[in-house]
Amino acid sequence: MAPEPQVRFEMAISENDVVGVYSNFLGVWHTPHEFTLDFAVTQPAMPGADEEGNAVTRVPCQVVARVRVPPTVLFDFLRTINENLSNYEANFGAIQRPPAGDVYPPDE
């Protein structure tokens, strides 16, 4: 029996999308049929109050891209992200997480 031919995905991207968009926040939710990934940009946190008057910190976020994928795609997505994260850290060192509570990157 002949081996299965290799499958190669040839990705194309429009000139409008080649630059990409910046995102520093990811929201994920799902239905029985798909996962939705909302990539967003956060703004500086602001003190505020909830409906009962309790103090809250509000972080305005603007969604810059929404991606919907079927659940079956998530396995390959997670595998690919993990492989790339390992490669990144092998090349550049471990990624340092910001301290808990930091919701907006400090000025550099």
Language-model features, listed with the residues they occupy:
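N-terminal intrinsically disordered, cationic/polar leader segments
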Residues: M1-T72, D76-E108
